[in-house]
Amino acid sequence: EAQRHIARELNLPDPSTIAFSPNTHDFLVRIFSAIPKRPVRVLATDGEFHSFRRQMARWVEAGEAILTSVSADELAATAQAGEFDLIFASHVLFNSGAIITDLEVLAALAKPEGPWVVIDGYHGFMGVETDLSAIAHRVFYVSGGYKYAMAGEGVCFLHAPPEFAPRPVITGWYAAFEDLALPPGAVGYAQDGGRFLGSTFDPSGLYRLNAVRRMLDAEGLTTAKISAYVAKLQKHFIDANSLPDFDLLNPFGTGNHARFLAYKGPDAAALHAQLESRNVITDVRSDVLRIGFGLYQDAEDVDRLVEILRAR
């Protein structure tokens, strides 16, 4: 059931390409393990999440990888001009809210023999409308239920395109669950997304994900409708101009918008702490304050936040 919900959300042609794991780091390690050459030539944006940055830094340190990091604006051109084995990019950058719109350009470069393209959809899944139907046969997509899917921890997933990475070196016994009758010594793999499965894990997150999706379906709430509602709250907050000393990194344009507003300023950490003392929950990444609005808030909540900010 969870596979079907995810496939419908992303417009994937086949739910069986989806595998589950407690975290996306597992999938990064398994994908990397399936690349036969060393060092692996990796291209990524300079705004990737901590788990990717830490693991990649360690692989570079160990001589396992050569990393090229560029800004999101330079990613597509660099990918087209260079020779890489792995291209990794967030759909929505966690620290700035910028949205990468060149997914089709990156996908056009992907081949089973390399390069492979991995899209980190953690801030995109159920946060912005995402249609992978045209590129599903070429790209990996990783995400999870911890953010906008409202399913909590421990329910992450990977869409693995057919014919790419058929035999990850890092593997668990679930990856051969359909082939347990193989003779001793044979290492079999599922032919679908199950080839990226690990071993025994707590499946309760899948039940939470299913429950959330059923509830949203019953209420007629799609990602598009929720995003439109949140965008009204975001614009209401922006119009109030209650953070004049901060720069908004992700102003509204003509396309999709992240579910959070990213404000950059030297006092971001101090303001985060000050708001927390007033029971206003935001988060901070270095000098960037992220303010997220959701379905459970309304214009009155925005006005209260504006009042608190103006009174500081």
Which residue ranges define each predicted feature?
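Structural signature of PLP-dependent enzymes
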Residues: 190-238
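Active-site PLP attachment segment
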Residues: 135-185
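Conserved PLP-binding catalytic core of the aspartate aminotransferase-like
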Residues: 227-278
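Substrate-binding/gating loop at the entrance of the active-site cleft, primarily
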Residues: 22-25, 30, 44-63, 73-75
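Conserved beta-loop-alpha segment that forms the PLP phosphate-binding cup at the N-terminus of a helix
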Residues: 1-39, 50
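PLP-dependent enzyme catalytic core of the Aspartate aminotransferase-like
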Residues: 113, 269, 273-312
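Active-site phosphate-binding strand-loop segment of PLP-dependent enzymes
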Residues: 68, 72-126
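A short helix->loop->beta-strand "cap" motif at the edges of active sites that frequently abuts
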Residues: 40, 64, 110-116, 138-139
